[in-house]
Amino acid sequence: MNWTGLYTLLSGVNRHSTAIGRVWLSVIFIFRIMVLVVAAESVWGDEKSSFICNTLQPGCNSVCYDHFFPISHVRLWSLQLILVSTPALLVAMHVAHQQHIEKKMLRLEGHGDPLHLEEVKRHKVHISGTLWWTYVISVVFRLLFEAVFMYVFYLLYPGYAMVRLVKCEAFPCPNTVDCFVSRPTEKTVFTVFMLAASGICIILNVAEVVYLIIRACARRAQRRSNPPSRKGSGFGHRLSPEYKQNEINKLLSEQDGSLKDILRRSPGTGAGLAEKSDRCSAC
């Protein structure tokens, strides 16, 4: 399996993540994906061919293997890593949408040169507002996926230990047969390692949610004690709802003032223009 594309996407999200989120990404790609690609796939590469039962009955080996190993460990871990990494793409799409809006605002303000647009693409987006909710939801989904997969793994393989010998009575085996698992010690070591890495990721996800909530509460308390100035600058200020509403009100007041000046200079224009002016004022 090629993990390069997934790594490229998550690396873009990593630029806008918290410090805990960057540690989580390192654990994902160093301690889980690298181990899965380099070592685990080779250890489980011959699991079906090396699963031997002491019988010559056709089909007995395959049936017993499917009974004791319904899902391969490697495929289960691969599916887990893909689903755990998918919520981070929500943050990537949200950041891309926010940067698109910033570029549109710059073009409307007359700053649509390539230098300013490239600066929007390079600068780090702060986790606040709707992006904060998107980021928290993505972390919560990561946490849920990790917990669900650990529970499913426990249901499939209780005890997390790879046994050396299993006894199979499934049809078409003629009687109870002994089946031998290849490399049980190596598989047990890698299983414990991958589950420990998954547990570390769960702890990091919980810590990141707590960190985001504490930082949001601290930011809100700071805003209450020190109200922000209306003359703020920067891309984030241009995108704030207060700034947009102030700009709209300013444009409406300028249009209303211009219309009243025209009426004062031209008193004979009639009641039609005055009525239009009153309607604009009511708006």
Curated annotation (Swiss-Prot):
Residue ranges annotated as Cytoplasmic topological domain: 1-22, 96-130, 215-283
Cellular component, GO annotation: connexin complex; cytoplasm; gap junction; lateral plasma membrane; plasma membrane; protein-containing complex
Entry keywords, A to Z: Cell junction, Cell membrane, Gap junction, Membrane, Phosphoprotein, Transmembrane, Transmembrane helix
Keyword Transmembrane helix on entry: yes
Residue spans crossing the bilayer: 23-45, 76-95, 131-153, 192-214
Subcellular location field: Cell membrane; Cell junction, Gap junction
Intervals, Extracellular compartment: 46-75, 154-191
Entry similarity comment: Belongs to the connexin family. Beta-type (group I) subfamily.
Role, per record: One gap junction consists of a cluster of closely packed pairs of transmembrane channels, the connexons, through which materials of low MW diffuse from one cell to a neighboring cell.
Name of the protein in its database record: Gap junction beta-1 protein
The species this protein was found in: Rattus norvegicus (Rat)
Recorded name of the encoding gene: Gjb1
